[in-house]
């Protein structure tokens, strides 16, 4: 958002064409192309409210120069020849892509409160997916089929940032350290800007579960 220029736009790295040939198969293989999309805030907020999805906003504590650089990076990334990227669910997704642009835009370095590269989380990719797919058993079942054994290896905090909630947490603790060694918080303030009143229970999938389906199949075969 830029009050001076009258800009209130949302850059979304999560756009894709579900009707593209072999979308699900290519997604499972990690060969899906996503792209950066831009929309005005009002349409974005209306869509998320309709879908029952709350939205948190983190106001970044950037200098005017850093803001201009970030806008320039996003604008360049949105050029037709640059906006499409090879999506990877764990390593290059709609959460990690904007992080890279923010880290490039700042003058200095972005320092996180925790050691981001140490394998000290005690969690794996599969652990995180199970945590955030609770109540969506068929989705969890499909993801388990697609993931290999490496999904069970411990990951570090930076890799865990493929989950937006972890990105949010680590950004809240991060500091920008400029070239003179002066530090300031990355996030100036945080607020919920789309409030739907929905709870996780509202999104729990109903009907037969994968385990029930397998049990039924065994009974029929027997």
Question: Where do the language-model regions lie?
Answer:
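Short coil/turn segments at secondary-structure boundaries
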Residues: 54-62, 86-89
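Structured loops at beta-to-helix junctions and adjacent beta-edge loops in soluble globular domains
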Residues: 14, 63, 146-148
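A structural motif
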Residues: 62-75
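Acidic/histidine-rich, surface-exposed loop or edge segments in extracytoplasmic proteins
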Residues: 47-56, 76-83
């Amino acid at each position: 958002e830029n009050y001076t220029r009258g800009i209130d736009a949302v850059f979304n790295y999560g756009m894709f064409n579900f009707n593209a040939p072999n979308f699900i198969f290519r997604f499972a293989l990690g060969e899906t192309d996503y792209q950066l999309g831009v929309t005005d805030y009002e349409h974005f907020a209306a869509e998320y409210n309709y879908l029952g999805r709350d939205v948190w906003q983190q106001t970044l504590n950037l200098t005017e120069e850093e803001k201009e650089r970030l806008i320039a990076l996003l604008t360049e990334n949105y050029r037709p020849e640059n906006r499409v990227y090879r999506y990877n669910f764990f390593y290059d997704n709609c959460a990690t892509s904007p992080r890279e642009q923010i880290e490039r835009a700042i003058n200095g370095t972005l320092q996180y409160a925790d050691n981001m590269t140490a394998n000290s989380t005690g969690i794996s990719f599969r652990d995180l997916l199970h945590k955030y797919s609770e109540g969506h058993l068929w989705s969890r079942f499909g993801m388990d089929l697609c993931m290999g054994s490496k999904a069970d290896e411990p990951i570090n905090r930076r890799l865990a940032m493929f989950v937006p909630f972890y990105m949010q947490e680590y950004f809240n603790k991060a500091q920008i350290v400029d070239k003179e060694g002066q530090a300031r918080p990355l996030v100036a303030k945080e607020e919920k800007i789309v409030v739907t009143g929905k709870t996780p229970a509202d999104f729990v999938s109903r009907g037969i579960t994968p385990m029930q389906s397998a049990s039924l199949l065994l009974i029929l075969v027997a």
